[in-house]
């Protein structure tokens, strides 16, 4: 029998906070999980530049409104909506409306791999 390292099941938000903002970045490999995610907390007008991943990314809008660009198509989404960008397809999102955007961005990988267009 081999010994395994126990990874605590609770990850405090402060441990995965991205920079000085409100967004959290969880990479599964660091915590014994097979998936990774961002918990986005953006003000209107904020969002990442155009990028892609070698795996699908699924978004779940928890609060607020967002404009998603997937390939050459744009979609409006709001609280309760779910959308997925296929692997290898350029995409981005921008918080719209008048309130903050809270959204879970699920990466189907234990590490987050991003290639930006510029």
Q: Model segments located where?
A:
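A short, N-terminal "cap"/entry segment at the start of jelly-roll beta-barrel domains
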Residues: 1-35, 115-118
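Short, conserved beta-strand element in jelly-roll/cupin
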Residues: 40-43, 52-68, 106
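A short hydrophobic beta-strand segment most commonly corresponding to one strand
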Residues: 37-40, 84, 98-116
């Amino acid at each position: 029998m081999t010994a395994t390292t126990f990874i605590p099941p609770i990850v405090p938000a402060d441990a995965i906070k991205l920079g000085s903002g409100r967004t959290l970045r969880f990479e599964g490999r660091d915590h014994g999980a097979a998936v990774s995610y961002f918990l986005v907390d953006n003000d209107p007008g904020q969002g990442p530049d155009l990028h892609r991943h070698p795996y699908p990314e699924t978004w779940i809008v928890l609060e607020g409104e967002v404009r998603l660009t997937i390939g050459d198509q744009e979609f409006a989404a709001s609280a309760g909506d779910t959308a997925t960008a296929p692997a290898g397809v350029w995409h981005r999102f921008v918080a719209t409306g008048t309130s903050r955007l809270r959204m879970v961005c699920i990466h189907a990988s234990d590490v987050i791999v991003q290639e930006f267009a510029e």
